[in-house]
Amino acid sequence: MAEEVSTLMKATVLMRQPGRVQEIVGALRKGGGDRLQVISDFDMTLSRFAYNGKRCPSSYNILDNSKIISEECRKELTALLHHYYPIEIDPHRTVKEKLPHMVEWWTKAHNLLCQQKIQKFQIAQVVRESNAMLREGYKTFFNTLYHNNIPLFIFSAGIGDILEEIIRQMKVFHPNIHIVSNYMDFNEDGFLQGFKGQLIHTYNKNSSACENSGYFQQLEGKTNVILLGDSIGDLTMADGVPGVQNILKIGFLNDKVEERRERYMDSYDIVLEKDETLDVVNGLLQHILCQGVQLEMQGP
């Protein structure tokens, strides 16, 4: 199968169990588009981690680096990042140990942002003026899913308003997209006063964070899943899907590559090391969808 799906021969692809990947891709192909849904993280998964050696901004960074944030606030947010990010990606701490730190980080950051008199109309401008970039091949990815009626569930611990605006400005915000994220709550005068619903951080991206969405229940029959993430916390994103039959987990290994490679290879079926494109995902989709059509035409 690895021979058939030429995209898996790419140098950035790591697989602990190629035979297992072969089986899963075969099952996804058999089910075709009718049975498939895609569940993805956003920051550093659909968006780029780096471009020309320079780090790209996350949905939070876009706001942090913008003109609408005071210098004072920016310094405080940067201090939080320097304190908590090493904890988030520390391979020697368990998720349980990291949890309280993540809640603390997100809560402090949200409180700082709420003091900034951010207005709803400013979001589009902030995104326009940022260095936000989606991964190479994003148009093919979003359009393929849309044209084949494959639901795309974006589960993000970032800022929903920002990432939605990025996708809109890239002209790929199609009706098959559903987003669960930290959405801003503006008061009647249009100023940011808080964030809606339950706080979503790196390590609670599971069914508990979106049980109220009822989203997966509507997708009965979509029992095959492609999951895309860039952190160990992303592995639970499909936990709310009832009756999953086949799931292919693809992980982008962007940072601290040496320290985290083994853990990622143990956790994800396919690991993409320092790969800033969606080539492998697009190649797999093409393979699954083409074969799905052929199988239908051939009959049982």
UniProtKB/Swiss-Prot annotation:
Residues that bear N6-acetyllysine: K256
Active site per database record: D41 (nucleophile), D43 (proton donor)
Principal place of residence: cytoplasm
Positions with a binding annotation for CMP: E88
Pfam family, one: UMPH-1
Catalytic activity: N(7)-methyl-GMP + H2O = N(7)-methylguanosine + phosphate; CMP + H2O = cytidine + phosphate; a ribonucleoside 5'-phosphate + H2O = a ribonucleoside + phosphate
Binding residue positions for Mg(2+): D41, D43, D230
UniProt cross-references to CDD domains, sorted A to Z: HAD_5NT (cd07504)
E.C. number(s) listed in UniProt: 3.1.3.91, 3.1.3.5
Binding site for N(7)-methyl-GMP: E88
Cellular location(s): Cytoplasm
Acetylation found in the keyword field: yes
A biological-process GO annotation: nucleotide metabolic process
Keyword Nucleotide-binding listed: yes
GO molecular function terms attached to this record: 5'-nucleotidase activity; magnesium ion binding; nucleotide binding
Binding site for substrate: S156, A157, K205
GO cellular component, one term: cytosol
EC class (word): hydrolase
Keyword annotations from UniProtKB, A to Z: Acetylation, Cytoplasm, Hydrolase, Magnesium, Metal-binding, Nucleotide metabolism, Nucleotide-binding
Organism superkingdom: Eukaryota
Free-text function comment from the UniProt entry: Specifically hydrolyzes 7-methylguanosine monophosphate (m(7)GMP) to 7-methylguanosine and inorganic phosphate. The specific activity for m(7)GMP may protect cells against undesired salvage of m(7)GMP and its incorporation into nucleic acids. Also has weak activity for CMP. UMP and purine nucleotides are poor substrates.
Assembly information from the UniProt record: Monomer.
UniProt family annotation: Belongs to the pyrimidine 5'-nucleotidase family.
Name this polypeptide is given: 7-methylguanosine phosphate-specific 5'-nucleotidase
Originating organism: Homo sapiens
Highest classification ranks of the organism: Eukaryota, Metazoa, Chordata, Craniata, Vertebrata
Originating gene: NT5C3B
